[in-house]
Regions:
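Domain-level signature for soluble enzymes in the chorismate/prephenate branch of the shikimate pathway
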Residues: 1-380
Length: 380
């Protein structure tokens, strides 16, 4: 037989499979109608487990895993169809509806905003992108930014979560597990690192370079080209620039933003020294209370899933079944819980779509712990 003959066989089989799949989904919808009429839940976990075991036992050993995966997905699709018919709701969906109805139409222009660092830090530049004229309060640590929000000292906080070169800011993701907050907006900020020193300093004079660990990582190739130079970590890039300005020395420099040149009376010895020219950091704006502004098309979630095979797959298959795009998946180990993780998800979906509402009704039941962090727009 030729390849075309095999493909014709596959096409014929696919036609039969599709007809049976449509028939199966139609019966699943009728079951959903019955469950709705008799006030029954969409999920019958015992029946699903028994059915999957029966399928696994009857399948050829070489195809057992494939068969179980296929039927697991079909069960997810059937349940999603039934949930839509049942109009699944939860306290979370009610909370989201309330936030949409009571959030003002315009994002605030002059609020009190906490950020880590000092004047000239990239977090402060992100504040300026998010707000017209923010009243910025500087904190020594990211932890202090979260605390300022929880205690009501500031309405908002701005924190970095990931960089296009260096990846996720793990310290921030770890703090997310310890604090109560909501995300109300995000921004992507172009990061352009300069090597700054006191007036009169020459590149050949530099013996020490100060900066934040993320900036150091983003400029690794440049730093490797400077043999004999010691790299010193600081709490943030602007603090590094300030330290250089106050040192009285011409043999030290800082990797910091161009804004620090005028702020601290420094000069640029080298510009755009990051490894990648297309270098962006994503910041999120956090608040104590849930606010959902018009146009929200991104959602962030945190989940602890049951510690058993297939738990993550069940969540991902929900996204797939509802046609919801996953922008980010991050996992962080849970403190004092061996080999267990908190999963962080960023989803691309309109907060107004029926698929989003259905997802928010279904997901909490799949998790040991579930946190809806917010739905928001990203400024680019």
């Amino acid at each position: 037989m030729e390849l075309s003959d095999y493909r014709r066989q596959i096409d014929d089989i696919d036609s039969q499979l599709l007809a049976l799949f449509y028939r199966r989904m139609d019966v699943a919808a009728q079951i959903g109608g019955y469950k709705k009429a008799h006030n029954l839940p969409a999920l019958d976990a015992g029946r699903e487990r028994a059915k999957l075991q029966q399928i696994a036992d009857s399948a050829p050993e070489a195809l057992r895993d494939y068969t179980v995966s296929l039927y697991s997905l079909m069960f997810e699709l059937s349940r999603s169809c039934q949930n839509r018919l049942l109009g699944i709701t939860s306290p979370l969906t009610a909370e989201i509806e309330h936030a949409i109805a009571h959030t003002p139409p315009l994002f605030p222009e002059h609020p009190a905003v906490a950020c880590q660092g000092v004047e000239g830090a990239y977090s402060q530049l992100a504040c300026d992108r998010l707000f017209t004229l923010p009243n910025v309060f500087y904190c020594a640590t990211f932890d202090a930014v979260f605390s300022a929000i929880e205690k009501g000292l500031c309405r908002y906080g701005v924190i970095p979560v990931e960089n296009s070169t260096a990846g996720s800011v793990n310290a921030v993701y770890d703090l997310m597990m310890r604090h109560n907050f909501r995300i109300v907006r995000s921004v992507r900020l172009k990061i352009d690192h300069c090597l700054l020193a006191r007036p009169g300093a020459q590149m050949s004079d530099i013996k020490e370079i100060y900066s934040h660990e993320q900036a150091i990582s983003q400029c690794s190739r440049f730093l490797q080209s400077l043999p004999g130079v010691t790299v010193v970590r600081c709490e943030n890039t602007a603090a590094a620039a300030k330290r250089v300005a106050e040192s009285g020395r011409t043999d030290v420099a800082a990797l910091a933003s161009r804004a620090c040149i005028g702020l601290y009376g420094l000069e640029s010895l080298a510009a755009s020294v990051q490894d990648q020219g297309n270098n962006y950091t994503r910041f999120v704006c956090i608040a104590k209370d849930l606010e959902i502004y018009p146009g929200a098309d991104r959602t962030s979630l945190m989940m602890v899933l049951p510690h058993k095979p297939g738990s993550l797959y069940k969540v991902l298959s929900r996204f797939y079944a509802l046609g919801i795009n996953l922008n980010k998946l991050e996992s962080r180990p849970l403190p004092e819980r061996d080999f267990e993780f908190m999963f962080y998800f960023d989803l691309e979906t309109s907060v107004y779509s029926p698929q989003f509402r259905q997802l928010m009704g279904e997901l909490p039941g799949l998790c040991e712990e579930f946190s809806y962090l917010g739905s928001y727009q990203e400024v680019v």
